[in-house]
Amino acid sequence: MSKQLILALSKGRILQETLPLLADAGIEPAEDFGKSRKLLFDTNLPDVKLVVIRAVDVPTYVQMGAADVGVAGKDTLLEHGAEGLYEPLDLEISRCKLMTAGIVGAEPTHARRRVATKFVNVARRYYAQQGIQAEVIKLYGAMELAPLMNLADEIVDIVDTGNTLRANGMEPRELIDEVSSRLVVNKASMTMKHDRLKPLIERLGQAVASRRETQA
C-alpha cells in the first residue's frame, strides 16, 4: 500500500467549512480549487493529496480504497451505508436536520403513504421502523414540489432554516437524524497507515474542539 495519503473532500458548502479545519491540522492545498480544473491537488505536505468530488461519491472512494480519508455529511453516510468505513470524528460543521415534511395540516391521501426523497434507503428504513407502509419515490431535487402536485404525501429531506418549506406551505414533521459532516477512514488504511492517520485524526479533533470553544 502506498505511503501517500489521499483525502477525498465534498464539493460545496462542506468543502468551504472543511478547509479551515484542515489548515489548523497542518494541511493546506497548494493552489486555489476555484481557479483550477484539476481533480487531484497537491498540498503543502509532499505525501498528502486532496481530491474534490461530489458528496455522494466520497463514501465510495474511501470504502474502495481509492482515498484513505474522506469528509462527508452524515446524511450521505446514512444513505450509502458504512461498510468498510471507520467514522472516528464528528467535524461539527454543515449542521442541519434530516426530517420528514408535508403540507401544513394535510393528511395522507394515498392508501400507502407516498414519500418523495433522494434518501431512498433512509426513508425505507425510517417508515418501516415506524410501522408505516410507504411507497418511496426517488427524486433528485425540488422535493417541496412533490406534495404540492399530489405526487407524494410527505418528503424526506435536509432541513436547515425551514424557509423553503414555509414558502411552499409546508412544515417539518418528524426528525430522522441530526446531520453534520464526519471524517471517515478506510478500514485497511487505518491498519496499514495507522502511524500517519492517528496524528491527523488527533489534530483534526483538536481543531474541532478549538472551534467549539471559540463559538461557545
Swiss-Prot record:
Keyword Transferase annotated: yes
Recorded GO MF terms: ATP binding; ATP phosphoribosyltransferase activity
Principal location class: cytoplasm
UniProt EC number: 2.4.2.17
Keywords: Amino-acid biosynthesis, ATP-binding, Cytoplasm, Glycosyltransferase, Histidine biosynthesis, Nucleotide-binding, Transferase
Localization terms from the record: Cytoplasm
InterPro entries per UniProt: ATP_PRibTrfase_cat (IPR013820), ATP_PRibTrfase_CS (IPR018198), ATP_PRibTrfase_HisG (IPR001348), ATP_PRibTrfase_HisG_short (IPR024893)
Highest taxon listed in the record's lineage: Bacteria
Cross-referenced Gene3D superfamilies: Periplasmic binding protein-like II
GO process annotations (BP): L-histidine biosynthetic process
Subunit structure: Heteromultimer composed of HisG and HisZ subunits.
Protein name: ATP phosphoribosyltransferase
Encoding gene (name): hisG
